[in-house]
Swiss-Prot record:
Reported pH dependence: Optimum pH is 7-8.
Stated induction or repression of this protein's expression: By isopropyl-beta-D-thiogalactoside (IPTG).
Protein name, UniProt field: 2-succinyl-5-enolpyruvyl-6-hydroxy-3-cyclohexene-1-carboxylate synthase
Gene3D superfamilies xref list: 3.40.50.970, TPP-binding domain
EC numbers: 2.2.1.9
Organism: Escherichia coli (strain K12)
Any one GO molecular-function label of the UniProt entry: manganese ion binding
Protein family (similarity comment): Belongs to the TPP enzyme family. MenD subfamily.
Length: 556
């Protein structure tokens, strides 16, 4: 009997079962203990294979692939700390709804807690973050193949969002020629091998429920808050709010076109918050709100009803409003709750939004990060997409720009970490095949620097803007102690990215003005390669410009 041959047959059942649940992209890191899984994936023609030497980046690559494809994406890693490196991507997926299938190879039980190399306690190591966790036994013919495939089917068939951790112990030998060991075990699944359906068919229950009193509430004074959603949903929400005559406060990730732009500025004006107090109902569609003033208003508002509609489960309301948490697909929910044509009830807010935008435009000429945030919509590629990093950059775009309705925008705004942003952007580009503009800060770029290796493989032009303000300048917006701010918060690194781009053979530009930036863009969009554009700016100018605009708009 060949242990290595049966390991591979066991793994082949697992991998084939994944294909029945829409898995097409599979991300693989190098490793020996994962050999049965890797070879089974390599032999299965249903998969598109992606590889990376860094498991943390690999997890985020899978996250980006899942964001665009809307399908589960599988990840294969070897045992030990390689598994732990998947934690950040798993956490993010749990908060933003992407489906990740983590296949983690493991040592067999007799090698755990006895000093064996690269052997750690892997079952349960992700605690409550996976939606499902499966600790498989060591491969054995004593367990029927139908148990293995139905176990996989149960976890994936009931998966609505988040990650599944499948821990797969394999005993040595891991290498060897295939023979007939386990062939009859494998063949007991019969014509399942020629079928394309799961062995066990289950489906998560997610049905939009109509609110029977909607006809009553839609005649009231309402406010629509739009969080993270798809491009198509964003366009529908904008039209829905316009028909109702309700003001729409759109997040940078809402893709609604933000009809009342610069909300993070005008929400700091007492006239705006006073007018919003007249709202009898707030309907929030989508979660993960960005703007500080929006979150402050959300926490303090007290309408008669506060509804949150999102297909992700959980409360999603840090302010704990009295109201309704409606778990539903946004587009489906809108169909069940049609708008009734009414005149807009807000008068002051549209005027403030226009004046706030004019205040931003008046400052657009200086070459800085706040001005770049405002101008970013001028640089979006046609038929493309935008990936926005975290920390200061996403807040500036949210506050100072007005992205077009229906233009795809992606980000990691679940746990809002700066780890894995370049890797996620790489996955977003690969899954879509579209021209992509990605924008991150210098610390975010440093954090995921080896992901530049992933950006060597793009199918359409990708431009990575690194806004180099020499540290974590978001802390300039916070009341951090002045005496310790630079050393313990900003942590300036005094680096540039020309040599990093050269190491991975990526094109590089460092423009000094808007004309040079536009020339760099024009060159970048011509070829299906990655271009790194480093925009070096004065350290605190972006944060200071935002603070000045907030003060100016608050007194309009």
């Amino acid at each position: 009997m060949s242990v290595s041959a049966f390991n591979r047959r066991w793994a082949a059942v697992i991998l084939e079962a994944l294909t029945r649940h829409g898995v097409r992209h599979i991300c693989i890191a190098p490793g020996s203990r994962s050999t049965p899984l890797t070879l089974a994936a390599a032999e299965n023609s249903a998969f598109i294979h992606h590889t990376h030497f860094d498991e943390r980046g690999l997890g985020h690559l899978a996250l980006g692939l899942a964001k665009v494809s809307k399908q589960p994406v599988a990840v294969i890693v070897t045992s030990g700390t390689a598994v732990a490196n998947l934690y950040p991507a798993l956490i993010e997926a749990g908060l933003t709804g992407e489906k990740l299938i983590l296949l983690t190879a493991d040592r067999p039980p007799e090698l755990i807690d006895c000093g064996a190399n690269q052997a750690i306690r892997q079952p349960g190591m992700f605690a409550s973050h996976p939606t499902h966790s499966i600790s498989l036994p060591r491969p054995t013919q004593d367990i029927p193949a139908r148990w293995l495939v139905s176990t996989i089917d149960h976890a994936l068939g009931t998966l609505h969002a988040g990650g599944v951790h499948i821990n797969c112990p394999f005993a040595e030998p891991l290498y060897g020629e295939m023979d007939d060991t386990g062939l009859s075990w494998q063949q007991r699944l019969g014509d399942w091998w020629q079928d394309d359906k799961p062995w066990l068919r289950e489906a998560p229950r997610l049905e939009s429920e109509k609110q029977r009193d909607w006809f009553f509430w839609r005649q009231k004074r309402g406010v629509v808050v739009a969080g993270r959603m798809s491009a198509e949903e964003g366009k529908k929400v904008a039209l829905w709010a316009q028909t109702l005559g309700w003001p729409l406060i759109g997040d940078v990730l809402s893709q609604t076109g933000q009809p009342l732009p610069c909300a993070d500025l005008w929400l700091g004006n007492a006239k705006a918050t006073s007018e919003l107090q007249q709202a009898q109902i707030v309907v929030q569609l989508g979660s993960s709100l960005t703007g500080k003033r929006l979150l402050q208003w959300q926490a303090s508002c007290e309408p008669e009803e506060y509804w949150i509609v999102d297909d992700i489960e959980g409360r999603l309301d840090p302010a704990h409003h009295r109201g309704r948490r409606l778990i539903a697909n946004i587009a489906d929910w809108l169909e069940l709750h049609p708008a009734e044509k009414r005149q807009p009830w807000c008068v002051e807010i549209p005027r403030l939004a226009e004046q706030a935008m004019q205040a931003v435009i008046a400052r657009r000429d200086a070459f800085g990060e706040a001005q770049l945030a405002h101008r970013i919509c001028d640089y979006l590629p046609e038929q493309g997409q935008l990936f926005v990093g975290n920390s200061l950059v996403v807040r500036l775009i949210d506050a100072l720009s007005q992205l077009p309705a229906g233009y795809p925008v992606y980000s990691n705004r679940g746990a809002s970490g700066i780890d894995g942003l370049l890797s996620t952007a790489a996955g977003v580009q690969r899954a879509s095949g579209k021209p992509t503009l990605a924008i991150v800060g210098d610390l975010s770029a440093l954090y995921d620097l080896n992901a530049l290796a992933l950006l060597r493989q793009v199918s359409a032009p990708l431009v990575l803007i690194v806004v180099n303000n020499n540290g974590g300048q978001i802390f300039s917006l916070l009341p951090t102690p002045q005496s310790e701010r630079e050393r313990f918060y900003l942590m300036p690194q005094n680096v540039h990215f020309e040599h990093a781009a050269a190491m991975f053979e990526l094109k590089y530009h460092r423009p000094q003005n808007w004309q040079e930036l536009e020339t760099a863009f024009a060159d970048a969009w011509r070829t299906p390669t990655t271009t790194v554009i480093e925009m070096v700016v004065n350290d605190t100018d972006g944060a200071q410009t935002l603070q000045q605009l907030l003060a100016q708009v608050s007194h309009l």
